[in-house]
Amino acid sequence: HILFEAGVLKKLLNYYNQNPETKNLLQGPLLYDDLKTISTHFDPKWRGQMYGTWATDERAKDKNAEPFKIEMTGCGVFSCRKDAWVGFNQKFHGFGGEEGYIQEKFRQAGHQAICLPFLRWLHRFGRPNGPTYPLTLWNKIKNYFIGHTELNLDVQPIYEHFSEWASKDQLDRLFKESVGEPQKKLWSKTSRELMSKAK
């Protein structure tokens, strides 16, 4: 359900040829159905049972613009060298939790999430026949707990956001099922600090 603009994959291979040692996570702008409007990244905000809201960096409106760092974005398209792949948590199940998580995992490994303005992709959001993969609220919450705990991020925002759909006892139970006894996991460094310090 992903389509690329003509020539994009050739440009991506050329980028790797020109940057053979890169261990960054490479992503690109989402192109909407009008084939003009783009979104380049997610703002780190909770909304509608998801972490991350689409946003646009004006620099990427020029396909030939220089690559730039992003904090997080959707995972419809991402690329890296095989030896640079940091992996998803094997406890993830169903839909949700990967966006923001995988970019942060690259940063904690000393690398970056990069937007390549030419790497444009069109995503079919509509599902006329419904999703063909597990899509449950409980899976989403568990995945967020698993990912945040693995990366030593604070889980309190998960409790706060999902309190609209689940009780404190239900969330504690999901936390325990996912990673152990309920507790707040605090992290001493913010994502933006790592973005500025990582190579």
Show which residues each predicted segment covers.
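Extended repeat-based solenoid scaffolds, especially LRR ectodomains
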Residues: 36-63, 191, 197-199
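Terminal low-complexity segments of carbohydrate-biosynthetic enzymes
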Residues: 71-75, 87, 133-199
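Donor nucleotide-sugar recognition loop
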Residues: 72-74, 82-115, 119-122
